[in-house]
């Protein structure tokens, strides 16, 4: 299988040299690093080329790397049922950069791109209806970013008295505690006063 994936990578690189920055085969999977502004043309090629025929878009997701200037990796997974192969496209984008929607090539990208927008805040140009899909309309922030607080910004709950959903600032009853899992207390055989069973 790795030989077939290497051949596929060479074929795509030969036919779309301006779109591919590099490729690698790891764990039996082919990953192509893609130039961001070439994504739509590359996806069209992968779908229509007789040697590829990646007609199924499996998923679109993102990975947050806040330490990098190009903060996000936008990752596409495709399946070719004709060739029995999978391919992953990965491209790096900055926080202020937009990504072209592939909705015109794969209509199933609609909700995937909405999810990536909702969770990471990545904007897709040319998308027919780019709005939140998993969080509430008034939700602040993007929960899959690594700088998003684990408590969120607001608490949403149903109020029995008002008989409606209410939004309130998060109030923590207890401050965060940092647990030291390498503590010398763990696993120590300390005998406490009055613990007669431990002495025998």
UniProtKB/Swiss-Prot annotation:
Catalytic activities: a quinone + NADH + 5 H(+)(in) = a quinol + NAD(+) + 4 H(+)(out)
EC number: 7.1.1.-
Location in the cell: Cell inner membrane
GO cellular component, one term: plasma membrane
Top-rank taxon: Bacteria
Signal peptide span: none
One term of GO molecular function: NADH dehydrogenase (ubiquinone) activity
Keywords, in A-Z order: Cell inner membrane, Cell membrane, Membrane, NAD, Quinone, Translocase, Transport, Ubiquinone
The UniProt record lists the keyword Transport: yes
Protein topology in the membrane: Peripheral membrane protein
Uppermost EC category: translocase
UniProt cross-references to InterPro entries, sorted A to Z: NADH_DH_suC, NADH_quin_OxRdtase_su_C/D-like, NADH_UbQ_OxRdtase_30kDa_su, NADH_UbQ_OxRdtase_CS
Family per record: Belongs to the complex I 30 kDa subunit family.
HAMAP family the record matches: NDH1_NuoC
Function summary: NDH-1 shuttles electrons from NADH, via FMN and iron-sulfur (Fe-S) centers, to quinones in the respiratory chain. The immediate electron acceptor for the enzyme in this species is believed to be ubiquinone. Couples the redox reaction to proton translocation (for every two electrons transferred, four hydrogen ions are translocated across the cytoplasmic membrane), and thus conserves the redox energy in a proton gradient.
Subunit structure, interactors included: NDH-1 is composed of 14 different subunits. Subunits NuoB, C, D, E, F, and G constitute the peripheral sector of the complex.
Protein name per UniProt: NADH-quinone oxidoreductase subunit C
Record gene name: nuoC
């Amino acid at each position: 299988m790795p030989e077939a994936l290497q051949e596929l990578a060479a074929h795509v690189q030969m036919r779309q040299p301006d779109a591919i920055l590099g490729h690698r085969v790891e764990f039996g999977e082919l990953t192509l690093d893609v130039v961001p502004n070439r994504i739509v043309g590359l996806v069209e090629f992968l779908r229509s080329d007789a040697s590829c025929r990646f007609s199924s878009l499996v998923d679109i997701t993102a990975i947050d790397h806040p330490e990098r200037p190009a903060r996000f990796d936008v990752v596409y997974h495709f399946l070719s049922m004709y060739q029995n192969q999978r391919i992953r496209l990965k491209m790096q984008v900055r926080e202020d950069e937009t990504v072209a929607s592939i909705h015109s090539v794969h209509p199933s990208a609609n909700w995937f791109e909405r999810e990536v927008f909702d969770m990471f805040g990545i904007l897709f140009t040319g998308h027919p209806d780019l709005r939140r899909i998993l969080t509430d309309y008034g939700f602040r922030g993007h929960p899959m970013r690594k700088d998003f607080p684990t408590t969120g910004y607001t608490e949403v709950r149903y109020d029995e008295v008002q008989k409606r959903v209410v939004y309130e600032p998060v109030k923590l009853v207890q401050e965060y505690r940092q647990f030291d899992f390498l503590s010398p207390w763990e696993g120590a055989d300390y005998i406490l006063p009055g613990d007669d069973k431990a002495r025998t």
